[in-house]
């Protein structure tokens, strides 16, 4: 006898769709598969490790350029609703500062830290930012770009902006 069943691999939207199927009597199993790593009760979702490795590889390349030119790079990664990518990639790459929506970000403290690092002889600086944060009252979605300009103005460190965005969704699958 043939029985219909669904194995749903994805995030919140996929699981909402699977729930709809179960309401019609179709059995479903959900496997967390999202680079955002924001599925409740899941340590790490399918795709997160690949996204992390992609970000780390790209930031390593940016850091090489930052080091040779004594530069700062504000790196924006996906994470509008959850800052796991920015947080873990920031830690993995030794970022000077990390901005995620879950933790209040003090821009002045970040700038002071960059100045102190510059004065101590550091040659490269990475500021990792999750997309869409922190939004001001007007809902400014270009915060990361503007942060890069303010860092350059206030520290004297040449600062570039890199939005990694959807390229982080690609890459050869990896597993930690």
Which residues does each predicted region cover?
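Short gly/pro/ser/thr-enriched loop/turn and capping motifs at secondary-structure boundaries
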Residues: 15, 34-39, 105-107, 135
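Acidic-glycine-rich active-site phosphate/pyrophosphate-binding loop
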Residues: 153-167
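Conserved small/polar residues in nucleotide/adenosyl-binding loops
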Residues: 1-5
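Acidic/polar active-site rim loop that often engages polyanionic ligands
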Residues: 31-44, 67-68, 93
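Accessory alpha-helical/coil subdomains and C-terminal extensions
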Residues: 8-10, 20, 27, 47-157
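Short, well-ordered, mixed-charge alpha-helical segments that flank or form enzyme active sites
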Residues: 14-18, 36-40, 81-85
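Catalytic, metal-anchored helix/loop core of enzyme active sites in primary metabolism
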Residues: 141, 167-176
């Amino acid at each position: 006898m043939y029985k219909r069943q669904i194995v749903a691999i994805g995030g919140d939207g996929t699981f909402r769709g699977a729930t709809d199927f179960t309401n019609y009597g179709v059995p479903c199993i959900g496997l967390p598969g999202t680079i955002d790593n924001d599925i409740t009760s899941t340590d790490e979702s399918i795709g997160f490790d690949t996204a992390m490795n992609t970000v780390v590889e790209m930031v390593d390349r940016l850091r090489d350029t930052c080091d040779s030119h004594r530069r700062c790079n504000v790196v924006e990664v996906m994470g509008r609703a959850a800052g796991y990518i920015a947080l873990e990639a920031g830690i993995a790459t030794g970022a000077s500062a990390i901005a995620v929506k879950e933790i209040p970000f003090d821009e002045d403290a970040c700038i002071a830290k960059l100045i102190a690092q510059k004065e101590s002889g550091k040659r490269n600086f990475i500021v990792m930012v999750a997309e869409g944060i922190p939004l001001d009252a007007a809902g400014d979605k270009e915060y990361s770009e503007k942060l890069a300009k303010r860092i350059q103005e206030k520290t004297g460190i040449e600062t570039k902006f890199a939005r990694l965005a959807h390229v982080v969704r690609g890459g050869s699958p990896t597993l930690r």
